Regions:
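N-terminal loops that bind phosphate or other acidic moieties
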Residues: 1-113
Length: 113
């Protein structure tokens, strides 16, 4: 049997690449071939799913504290992961998030790099 493991991350647990590799390992142990593909919906995990080396830029986080956000050039196109500049994890998480005081200015700064 041939299996295709095309998966996104398990939020807070494993990256898309780790999930695909775990499925691939289980398939191999069961005697099946598996093609592993890490996917992303464009948010958190996008750059990891693309693979390769990222560049980073220091930008304003959603609550004003500077954060390091990744980006890269992929086949002549700049790819950013908005979650690294303005996502919930850099906005204090679900417990400390301040939607009315937060800003996505850091995403704009990342685009301007």
């Amino acid at each position: 049997m041939q299996v295709v493991a095309a998966v996104d991350k398990f939020r807070g647990t494993a990256t898309a690449r780790e999930v695909a590799q775990a499925i691939g390992q289980a398939c191999w142990e069961a005697g099946h071939d598996c093609a592993e593909f890490a996917l992303a919906d464009g948010g958190e995990g996008l750059l990891d799913a693309l693979g390769g080396a990222n560049r980073t830029a220091r930008v304003s986080g959603p609550l004003g504290t500077p954060v390091e956000a990744g980006w890269r050039l992929h086949r002549g196109t700049a790819v950013i992961e908005m979650a690294q500049a303005s996502g919930l994890t850099v906005a204090g998480g679900a417990e400390r998030n301040d939607p009315l005081g937060a800003s996505t200015a850091g995403t704009g700064e990342l685009i301007d790099v």
